[in-house]
Amino acid sequence: MKKINLLGIEVKCHNKREESLICIIKRGVKDFYRTFKNKPYSIGDAYYRLFGKIESLYFMDLVNHDNYKLMTDRLFNLYIFTREKAENHR
């Protein structure tokens, strides 16, 4: 069983499918930082895509309720921070 750190929380993967899903989300979080430079208006879409993927981890029982709430809070803060940065960047 492999543990991957996602938004400051260790997520346990039981198989390759779970591991690749978490890696996709991790990449998505990294891309999120870069989005505002090229496409400030697509930040909202990127946020909802990531939010949906994190929700799927919750439904797959890979994260418990507290960790899910913590992740979504952190993701929302990241969204606000990135959106403000994008607005200042214009």
Regions found by a protein language model. Give the residues of each.
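Acidic, Ser/Pro/Thr-rich low-complexity regulatory regions
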Residues: 2-90
